[in-house]
């Protein structure tokens, strides 16, 4: 029997029914949030902390007066569970629901809007009634590109997160499909997980986790083991992976402001070498992390001695050039151009910077800009044969691009002309038909008039 049927049979309002029969779903068991299932949902899975949930709802005061409804707006309400984006009662109640479920919640003021209320619709210390339908839920898109989806099984402690270079101790379980291929405790440095056969998606996720947090990570190939796969674990190229990760402890690396210039320069030399090792191994995202550290440490460093300034500029120039090469490999051409711009800001005649920017712009179909960069390369080094070949490629690609555009526009104009001709033909046909009808009517009328005239004579 549904709650509505129960309410009708007993003559009680839904609010009274929940107050009498509702299940206390609070951790304190203080009857602050009572729940009755109106329609059973599908399966056994419920939303986790951080999941994006989609609901329809109706909200009423205890006297039955409606104060809000997503149905009136004809669109679902969306929020992230467990992130304090809604009242406490919702974070508690929606976490117990299954997809497709409809429930009634009765929420005491301390789990709703408290003594403040929410003027003008909700008075102070109001007990609220909600009917909620859980339409859908999905994990948190950590990087907003769909590559790492997190579902939090257990919320962490505090507000601090590991940073790049932090030492972490984690427990992990890795699965590909139904098969578990990895299960262990491991300590490593964030950004260097590859050295321990850990995919970069875990490094990225750890920077958003708190101590003792337990989560499930769904990694796309880009953040897993990529095109190379992982033969050691029997992972095929471009496989999607699932990891369950618990962050047991961590020690943050020094932030930039905690390091003096000498330490930054020393560390820059170390991470530059690490980045080069990753790059040569085809681990371009790992290399980006290392070269990026140099930029974060030195780009805004001021008050340096002449010797320090020269060393800093050398590290930054190398970092920007190497980042540009990494982004070219990762097919992130806009970022490659940005890094080349930074490098050329330090050395406007840098041959590598000009060439790599030209490469990126050629791949972005910016043929004239690319050609200009390759021509500048020849001004710096007339012996650069690769730049000459690239200029020819720019000219060829530009010609092909223009010819393709001409064909597209020619076909487009042809279709427009055919459509116009067809419309004109239809208009002409309509006019001719109209005139034919008029003439026919005119002839008939004339004949009648003639007959009448003859009759009168």
From Swiss-Prot:
It catalyses: [protein]-peptidylproline (omega=180) = [protein]-peptidylproline (omega=0). Inhibited by both FK506 and rapamycin. GO terms for biological process: chaperone-mediated protein folding. Its EC number is 5.2.1.8. Acetylation impairs ability to promote interaction between Akt/AKT1 and PHLPP1. Deacetylation by SIRT7 promotes interaction between Akt/AKT1 and PHLPP1, leading to suppress Akt/AKT1 activation. InterPro entries: FKBP4/5/8-like (IPR050754), PPIase_dom_sf (IPR046357), PPIase_FKBP_dom (IPR001179), TPR-like_helical_dom_sf (IPR011990), TPR_rpt (IPR019734). Immunophilin protein with PPIase and co-chaperone activities. Component of unligated steroid receptors heterocomplexes through interaction with heat-shock protein 90 (HSP90). Plays a role in the intracellular trafficking of heterooligomeric forms of steroid hormone receptors maintaining the complex into the cytoplasm when unliganded. Acts as a regulator of Akt/AKT1 activity by promoting the interaction between Akt/AKT1 and PHLPP1, thereby enhancing dephosphorylation and subsequent activation of Akt/AKT1. Part of a heteromultimeric cytoplasmic complex with HSP90AA1, HSPA1A/HSPA1B and steroid receptors. Upon ligand binding dissociates from the complex and FKBP4 takes its place. Interacts with functionally mature heterooligomeric progesterone receptor complexes along with HSP90 and TEBP. Interacts with NR3C1. Interacts with Akt/AKT1 and PHLPP1; enhancing dephosphorylation and subsequent activation of Akt/AKT1. Interacts with IFI44L; this interaction modulates the kinase activity of IKBKB and IKBKE. Interacts with IKBKB and IKBKE. This is Peptidyl-prolyl cis-trans isomerase FKBP5.
């Amino acid at each position: 029997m549904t709650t509505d049927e129960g309410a009708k049979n007993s003559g009680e309002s839904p609010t009274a029914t929940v107050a009498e029969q509702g299940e206390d779903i609070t951790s304190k068991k203080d009857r602050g949030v009572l729940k009755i299932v109106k329609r059973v949902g599908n399966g056994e899975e419920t939303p986790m902390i951080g999941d994006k949930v989609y609901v329809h709802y109706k909200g009423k005061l205890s006297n039955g007066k409606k104060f809000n409804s997503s149905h009136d707006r004809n669109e679902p309400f969306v929020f992230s569970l467990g992130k304090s984006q809604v009242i406490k009662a919702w974070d508690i109640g929606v976490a117990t629901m299954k997809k497709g479920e409809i429930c009634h919640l009765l929420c005491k003021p301390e789990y709703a809007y408290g003594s403040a209320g929410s003027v003008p619709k909700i008075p102070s210390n109001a007990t609220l009634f909600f009917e909620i339908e859980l339409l859908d839920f999905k994990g948190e898109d950590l990087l907003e590109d769909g590559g790492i989806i997190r579902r939090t099984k257990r919320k962490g402690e505090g507000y601090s997160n590991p940073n790049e270079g932090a030492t972490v101790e984690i427990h992990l379980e890795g699965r590909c499909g139904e098969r578990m291929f990895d299960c262990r405790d491991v300590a490593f440095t964030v950004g260097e997980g590859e050295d321990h056969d850990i995919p970069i998606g875990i490094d990225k996720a750890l920077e958003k986790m708190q101590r003792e947090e337990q989560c499930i990570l769904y990694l796309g190939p880009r953040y897993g083991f990529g095109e190379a796969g992982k033969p050691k674990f029997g992972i095929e190229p471009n496989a999607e992976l699932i990891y369950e990760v618990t962050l047991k402890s961590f020690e943050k690396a020094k932030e930039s402001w905690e390091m003096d210039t000498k330490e930054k320069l020393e560390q820059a030399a170390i991470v530059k070498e690490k980045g080069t090792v990753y790059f040569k191994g085809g681990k371009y995202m790992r290399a980006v992390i290392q070269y990026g550290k140099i930029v974060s440490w030195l780009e805004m460093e001021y008050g340096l001695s002449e010797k320090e300034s020269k060393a800093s500029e050398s590290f930054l120039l190398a970092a920007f050039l190497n980042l540009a090469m990494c982004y070219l490999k990762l097919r992130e051409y806009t970022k490659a151009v940005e890094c080349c711009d930074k490098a050329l800001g330090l050395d406007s005649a840098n041959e590598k910077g000009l060439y790599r920017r030209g490469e990126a712009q050629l791949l972005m179909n910016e043929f004239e800009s690319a050609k200009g960069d390759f021509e500048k390369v020849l001004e710096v080094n007339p012996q650069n044969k690769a730049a000459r070949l690239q200029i020819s490629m720019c000219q060829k690609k530009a010609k092909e691009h223009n010819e393709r555009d001409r064909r597209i526009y020619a076909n487009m104009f042809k279709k427009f002309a055919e459509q116009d001709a067809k419309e004109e033909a239809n208009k002409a046909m309509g006019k001719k038909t109209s005139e034919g009808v008029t003439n026919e009517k005119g002839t008939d009328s004339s004949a009648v008039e003639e007959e009448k005239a003859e009759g009168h004579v």
